Amino acid sequence: MAVSHGFNLTEATTSVSAPVQVSSGLQIIVGTAPVNQLANPAAAVNTPLYVSTYKEAVAAVGWSSDFAKYTLCEAISANFQVVGTAPIVVINVLDPANKKHITALDETSVQVNDGVAEIDKVGILLEKLVVKKDTTALTADVDYIASFNDDGTVSLALITGGAGDGATTLTVSGSILDASKVTADDIVGGVNAATGAETGLEVVRQAYPKLSKAPGILLAPRFSKNAQVCAALQAKCRKINGLFNAVCFVDLDCSADGAQKYTDVAEQKTKQTATSREAYALWLYVKVGETVYSGSSMAAAATVYNDSQNGDRPVASPSNVTIPISAACLEDGTE
């Protein structure tokens, strides 16, 4: 038998530690996610998705580290990567079937290097992607294989023997699922009078009948700085399904249009309508390293973790509880 002498090095991908499973204070989070990365994006739109691990969450709604654009990813990171709590329920409102959420990917040329071309755009809908070699349209999985990179951009790998084989440039066009097009109205949502379909915060009602889970904390990270969203969150906390009461965590606007000094917070809280007993108003964002998180995402996760330290009972205030952050900051990252 061979005997190894000296030092040996083995490298493994860093994994996310298992989160603490908490039965109280279930977070229901409404926001945006890069669902264009999924095989069936429509299945992750305006429906409550229950996730217990980081892996489940990414499989359910996709992943991006651009938290300003994809707010559900921020909440996923705050819970599973930073604080270490689970489960959560996520409701994505970014909808590939909504023309208002679509931006055209105008025809553009991309260079092919060693049989691979890179499309430097995020949000691309693969089913709408048109790829050409000169004037010849290429067929997905026959002439090329499209895949998402870690940053959400797309790689096109040409298949040997396919119609694109040997190309030095390709022409691409299609559609982009654009998170910047989501508005406060999308988050607040509503009910379609003809079909009864619910969107946005109206979907909160579905958590109990679909998942058998009672809501505890409602939040819409970053979007809740809007007074309309803030008011809707508070209204949704009362008598959910005619039975359950919840609280909501809302972000006070700390952009140039909001409160950038603590002396302006009281006025901003009133301006934003964050005045009910259900509303926990959070001023300032936070940093973990150089990554910026909204106050609502981090505080909600920390509150649930605090419950876990008290037998899953929401009996202790999360006030003055230590959380793993590097700094407090404004929305733009200014400390």
What kind of region is each of these model predictions?
Residues A2-Q21, L26-V45, L49-S52, G62, ...:
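A glycine- and small-residue-enriched flexible loop/hinge signal that marks low-structured segments
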Residues V142-D143, S147-A167:
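A surface-exposed beta-strand-loop module
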Residues N46, L126-V130, A167:
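Exposed beta-strand and adjacent loop surfaces of beta-rich binding modules
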Residues T85-D150, I176-D178:
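Extended beta-strand solenoid/passenger and fiber regions
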Residues T168-I176:
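Short, hydrophobic/aromatic-enriched beta-strand segments in well-ordered soluble domains
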Residues L177-D186:
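Glycine-rich, low-complexity segments
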